[in-house]
């Protein structure tokens, strides 16, 4: 069956820091990225895509091109500038106006509470390694629910807790720029899952007319050969990257196998996971109340056994073939010569999306529904005569939508797909040369231009089925 269904969301995704700009306007406090990017000195988010001032235009574009859902996030430090003190009414008003504009344009808002942008004050106090962050986050969520919960029907607690942990404490390309500290990464992930569970409990206690879920980045993990050692490496990477958090969210516990495996990884890296009194009870209570899983999928990894110390080189330039990723006690991610990659060395493997969707259905039968909340292709778009022919992006998205249809036909409940990104936005580690948007942003003028992919996306959104993109007039 080639039909997605009448209620399927064809959305576009954004994030506050990557899109809004206005980092110092209307009482916004600093977040972790303001200081970090200033020190790095390569680019800033001060203007980004200027969504703060141009959201009405972007939502009109969305309506015109059949985008019927949008992922936005609420900048914690725009609403509570230091993360824990007084509420900034101008910050709340911006999001209230933004939500109203979404509804006016028939674009359903999916609203994320944490998308990589902890307020600077709380970051300096330890971020998600500091348990106080949990209570501050719950309070922030309550402020948002009270102000916007009458209109927002889809809430997301966290975007990609694994990415927060991996990039901040293992790769080191996000603040606090620590490398190879797997124990800190795992501890921060656990603490975020406790915060997630407490926010789910809070939301349900408020009897609001809506749903709440979480977004995980879920990557397939495959052995590069059939050897026992390579299979073990793929298993270990899957455990730390995916199963650790999925078990917390949907089982409300760390089953014996998960607990044993995570502790072995921690031990090999000189640490241990600390679970505090009451944590597991909180996870268990929330696990039956989560309404949906948001799944971000860009690529899968191929693993081989690795016995050495951790070694990572992050490809942040688009210089193909420069990535290195080997973790002590886990394995090494390697290229599969049969699988193409992007310029940033991300394997293009739609089968991994299908496999992951089916795995969720089989391993977590209590899941209710899935939204693919991010998927897209970073590309050095060629802007010629006011047009961008991004056929490789269309091909990438088309193949991943085919994988979703296959999973739906096998009984997986998938209710929406959000392309990353709605318009070109700031890339956390690549700045402005890595573009994902349906709409091209000229960052000098902030003018928007529809890419060929936008015209194709409009057709599939209206027809609720895949179409031959060679037929698109552009």
Curated annotation (Swiss-Prot):
Q: Which family does it belong to?
A: Belongs to the glycosyl hydrolase 1 family.
Q: Where do the annotations place D-galactose 6-phosphate binding?
A: 18, 115, 159-160, 296, 427-428, 434, 436
**The entry's keywords:** Glycosidase, Hydrolase
Q: Which EC class is the enzyme in?
A: hydrolase
Q: Name one GO cellular component term.
A: cytosol
Task: Look up the domain of life of the source.
Answer: Bacteria
Enzyme Commission number(s) of this protein: 3.2.1.85
User: What name does the UniProt record give this protein?
Assistant: 6-phospho-beta-galactosidase
Q: Does the keyword Plastid apply?
A: no
Q: According to its UniProt record, which residues of this chain constitute the active site? A: 160 (proton donor), 374 (nucleophile)
Keyword Hydrolase among record annotations: yes
Pathway as given in its UniProt record: Carbohydrate metabolism; lactose degradation; D-galactose 6-phosphate and beta-D-glucose from lactose 6-phosphate: step 1/1
| Catalysed reactions, semicolon-separated | a 6-phospho-beta-D-galactoside + H2O = D-galactose 6-phosphate + an alcohol
**HAMAP family the UniProt entry points to:** LacG
Show the stretches that span the lipid bilayer: none
Stored Gene3D superfamilies: Glycosidases (3.20.20.80)
The record's InterPro entries line, in alphabetical order, gives: 6P-beta-galactosidase, Glyco_hydro_1, Glyco_hydro_1_AS, Glyco_hydro_1_N_CS, Glycoside_hydrolase_SF
GO BP terms in the entry: lactose catabolic process via tagatose-6-phosphate
